Amino acid sequence: MVKSFLEKLKASKPVAQKDRILIYGTAGIGKSEFAANFRKPVFLMSQGETGLLKLMEYGSVPEIPFFEFRNGPGKHNAIDDYLTALDDLATGQHDHATVVTDVFSGIVEMLRQKVLHEDFKGDDGKKEGGFNHFGAGAEKMMAKIITEFLPRFDAINSKGMTVVLLCHSETKLIQNPEGADYMKYITAMPEKIHNRIVNWADMVLFCKSEPILKGEKAGFGDKMTYKAVGENRLIRTVDSPASAGKNRHGLPSEIEMGSSGTEAYQNLVAALKESKEKKTAATAAS
């Protein structure tokens, strides 16, 4: 007997899946080392990214499988190789548990170059036929992100792997309709692509450094002055006026990164475990 929709609805249970994670931050904050500590990672590197190679060279992380996608002179087909690699990871037999793109903002720039040269013949002008004619190029890029990139990430995720996208950061002026405008950290990607990836991700983690200040009284009137004597490296897990963020796990708003990528990963795992235990206890008590 065929079950009705309502019978299927009542019988359905959520299937646990690994997370889709966007990690971004300032240069040198430790994004690659952080991601290298995820379970059984493989790194897909955009052209010119050397962070993982330096970490392996100096023994900061163990040897990790990687591939750099590089365009040859006058060529723009490396982005196709990247998409093929995603397909192979989604369908092939392997023991990788985490797929890291380092950095996805670099992959997006490679996509921009491909669209610019193949769809607009290298014309980045604002006149008709140009990449920047009423956002024509950005729209083509966005369409490819939606139809070619996200489905592949989801296919990898459905196979039981964690998807991690690393991005560089930049600041953006936010026009505030209720008060003064302000600056906010976001990913270094076109705004629409940034928004789409943030909506898609389960976690958006902003890695930042805050100075540790020491105050001293000096000069006329014992005026208080401050100097930096160290730094705190933090992972911000929620959205705020200062930075884009998100999580679906009830994480604290900030998690200590510690002094290494290993510490950062261990602290994230501990925070996830604590959050899950709190939810379980709350459910049992209700």
Regions found by a protein language model. Name each.
Residues 84-87, 91, 151-155, 202:
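Surface-exposed alpha-helical segments enriched in charged/polar residues
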Residues 41-43, 163, 204-206:
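Short, well-ordered beta-strand core segments
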Residues 2-6, 11-101, 105-113:
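Conserved P-loop
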Residues 103-193:
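P-loop NTPase motor core
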